[in-house]
Structure formats: structure tokens, C-alpha cells
Regions:
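Extracellular, repeat-based ectodomains that mediate carbohydrate processing or recognition
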Residues: 1-134
Length: 134
């Protein structure tokens, strides 16, 4: 299986959301869609984008940048999912969307995620001005 994420911008290109789609990759490497795509972020005002995903066992982590959700420019947010035991392809949200960055002044961007184990992820990102040297 593979998970694809992308940003979908609305008509005025100011508001955008992060979407994901699960794919099955056959032996001959032909992808087929599993289920329907869905929006990952719950905060839908302004721009959400620059998403990254990682998987481990039955867990999938998604992280992204969100404009003004943390009160100051871009912040980093994440959501964990697990695959459904009832059938292949269904993703079930684990917990709620969480803010990753604790320093909120200025821009936090370019998140990257790796799953360390099921339900444990590590996320790294750029933080501008956090050390006050710009």
C-alpha cells in the first residue's frame, strides 16, 4: 500500500487543504485507488500545505504547515491514522490533530515525518527566528 498527500487550493488560491488517498500497488506496480480521498486538516481557514507522510506497520503519520492556525504565520500540525482491521484501505483517525511546534513566533515550515513505531512519530521542520538570529 501507498499513501499520497497533496494540497488542494480553492479558486482564490488563498485557502487550501491537505488531502490524502490510499493506493494499492500490485505486483506489476500498477496503482489502484482504495476508498476515497479525504481532507486531513480540521482547521480549514487559510492555507494548509507542504504535507509529508510516513508509515510503520498499521500506523500512518501525516504532518503539514498551517497558516495562522498557531496565531503567528505558519505552524506545524500532525495527525495519526491506523489501517482498519475490518478491511484493507480504510484509514481510521487516531486522536485529534495536534500542533507540533511550541515556538509560535514567525514561520515554522517544511515539516518532514518518520514513524518510529506504531503511534510514535518524529517530525522535524524549519523554525525561522527561534534562535533570534533570523
Amino acid at each position: 500500500m501507498a499513501l499520497v498527500t497533496w494540497s488542494h487550493l480553492e479558486g482564490d488560491i488563498v485557502n487550501g487543504d491537505v488531502y490524502t488517498q490510499l493506493l494499492n500497488i500490485s505486483v506489476d506496480r500498477t496503482p489502484t485507488l482504495i476508498g476515497s480521498s479525504f481532507r486531513v486538516n480540521t482547521f480549514s481557514s487559510k492555507e494548509q500545505g507542504y504535507a509529508d507522510t510516513a508509515g510503520f506497520g498499521n500506523s500512518v503519520g501525516v504532518t503539514w504547515s498551517s497558516l495562522d492556525q498557531d496565531g503567528s504565520s505558519y505552524g506545524i500540525f500532525a495527525q495519526n491514522y491506523r489501517t482498519s482491521a475490518s478491511g484493507p484501505g480504510a484509514l481510521i483517525k487516531v486522536g485529534t490533530e495536534v500542533q507540533v511546534n511550541t515556538f509560535t513566533s514567525g514561520l515554522q515550515g517544511s515539516p518532514s515525518v518518520v514513524m518510529l513505531s506504531e503511534n510514535r512519530m518524529m517530525i522535524v521542520w524549519h523554525s525561522f527566528d527561534q534562535d533570534f538570529s533570523s
